[in-house]
Amino acid sequence: MKSQNKYSIRKFSVGASSILIATLLFLSGGQAQAAEKQVNMGNSQEDTVTAQSIGDQQTRENANYQRENGVDEQQHTENLTKNLHNDKTISEENHRKTDDLNKDQLKDDKKSSLNNKNIQRDTTKNNNANPSDVNQGLEQAINDGKQSKVASQQQSKEADNSQDSNANNNLPSQSRIKEAPSLNKLDQTSQREIVNETEIEKVQPQQNNQANDKITNYNFNNEQEVKPQKDEKTLSVSDLKNNQKSPVEPTKDNDKKNGLNLLKSSAVATLPNKGTKELTAKAKDDQTNKVAKQGQYKNQDPIVLVHGFNGFTDDINPSVLAHYWGGNKMNIRQDLEENGYKAYEASISAFGSNYDRAVELYYYIKGGRVDYGAAHAAKYGHERYGKTYEGIYKDWKPGQKVHLVGHSMGGQTIRQLEELLRNGNREEIEYQKKHGGEISPLFKGNHDNMISSITTLGTPHNGTHASDLAGNEALVRQIVFDIGKMFGNKNSRVDFGLAQWGLKQKPNESYIDYVKRVKQSNLWKSKDNGFYDLTREGATDLNRKTSLNPNIVYKTYTGEATHKALNSDRQKADLNMFFPFVITGNLIGKATEKEWRENDGLVSVISSQHPFNQAYTKATDKIQKGIWQVTPTKHDWDHVDFVGQDSSDTVRTREELQDFWHHLADDLVKTEKLTDTKQA
């Protein structure tokens, strides 16, 4: 159903708009002699209908526009004839309403005596002429309009009796179209602008007369060309340059059609004056952003979720694995976003070392091609450069901070990144001095105040017996790396993050050649991987290389899903523990060191709480910087309950998981009051 819009014609304080409206309505009624001189009959017909029919103009005008590009002059003639038959009643009604609206204004403007040529010449000299200047010389145009009205009524009666004959007589010849004067071009454009004025009146009825006068301050320069605005839904009359070219040019018809189409799609023709700027500003204020900008989130600093060992983002994970952040229960990142927290899921190596993963995390946030460092690559025997990241926070620099939240090994990776940002890599600096070449900004150090908080969930800060006793066995490592080799073929979307070790088939490399090359990789005998870094020895080495930053808020969350056995001091896995962790949970539960036995299936409670060599305290409502704030252990929470990956667990509900993450995110927002360097 097409809408029937009602319009009100605005009255200007000086009467210019009312007189102009009346004149144009008279001139366009019934296609009188003045209208016959207009260029392009198809456009003249549309403008006549537009000016005469206020209530039904949308339906007939759209139909004419659809036929405009596919019909010839004969079709325009037939269309005009049909419209003349209906214009009689409509024209008389509109003329009567227009006379009533403008009765008072016409009395004030009877002193105007300039002819139409003077109007065109004056407006050409001064494009910004006041509306009062336009009033001059319109009296003659009004008289001509009245004559046109009579002629229009007579033509309408003749059209009722003999449409075909009179239609041909009323149509201007091709030669007369070419001789159309500039004033009729002005009338044609003005009719379209008058309708657009009524649209603005409908949207903003409270505009004062002064603003209306500015909006209708027209510029009828003969060299104007219609151009659409790029940033505003308004069309400036100054953009109409070069529109009125010589009527003899063969491309004139297309130019006119394009011009009228653009005028139709525009809200109103205006000049870039104060009134226009005010309207544009209001329109921009009313626009709603579909994607919240940084300032519209609760958190000023983005939250970056960093996965642990054997972690993937959905675009590169094996199909057998669940979504890392939330599993089948919920999408944690998306839920945070929907509740007003800006968050991202980092995509880094699943089996790489903490060092390699930290470098990748830096480029994931900052953007660019991963540079593991010339010295590091030479030391461990893998490629120096890795994949290229687009970057989620390209303006990341001192003073522009992020919240880093790491699950499992992700917490260690975050600590390694913070150390590199603040203190750099001495080996890389010395190597660059000796051998020359480029060095990544990450390794130069002096990049403090880029991290607001560090939060760890079930992180083995001091390593885990699971990696000591099982994960670091040669057989286990061989199986995992073989799987990585298999998924490294060029047709696989799965990415284990070991391409720097050669575990990625090249585009023009056969699979046999790829397997032979992988066998020669240094990965099989290197400690530069996640298996070693998760051992108690590897974690201790990281603890020695890292330190607490006095400008960062640290907090740890720890789970426990074991219970004491009946006849011993050993810990047994709970019934609701994630099934794949039952073996490792029982293995850790019988460790020689009793304090290490209580665990979440993969990580001992004592290892998850804080690094042994760094300061810690119990977490309270008082937020502190530069010290590990240890939250109470969450009983009956296994290693993946923090991220909701166990879909079979009925004890830990979706609502509980959602509440945990909302509380965590709200905590991060509170820390910004303490870590915001702009407020300090």
UniProtKB/Swiss-Prot annotation:
InterPro entries: AB_hydrolase_fold, Lip-like_C, YSIRK_signal_dom. It is an enzyme of class 3 (hydrolase). Keywords: Calcium, Hydrolase, Lipid degradation, Lipid metabolism, Metal-binding, Secreted, Signal, Zymogen. GO terms for cellular component: extracellular region. Residues 1-34 form the signal peptide. Residues 84-112, 224-234 have a biased composition (Basic and acidic residues). Ca(2+) binds at residues 638, 641, 646, 649. Residues 148-170 have a biased composition (Low complexity). Belongs to the AB hydrolase superfamily. Lipase family. It is found in: Secreted. Gene3D superfamilies: alpha/beta hydrolase. It catalyses: a triacylglycerol + H2O = a diacylglycerol + a fatty acid + H(+). One of its GO terms (molecular function) is triacylglycerol lipase activity. Residues 35-290 form a propeptide. Residues 125-138, 204-223, 235-246 have a biased composition (Polar residues). Its main location: secreted. This is Lipase 1. It comes from the Bacteria. Its EC number is 3.1.1.3. The gene is lip1. Residues 82-259 are annotated as: Disordered. It comes from Staphylococcus aureus (strain COL). The active site is at 408 (nucleophile), 600 (charge relay system), 639 (charge relay system). One of its GO terms (biological process) is lipid catabolic process.
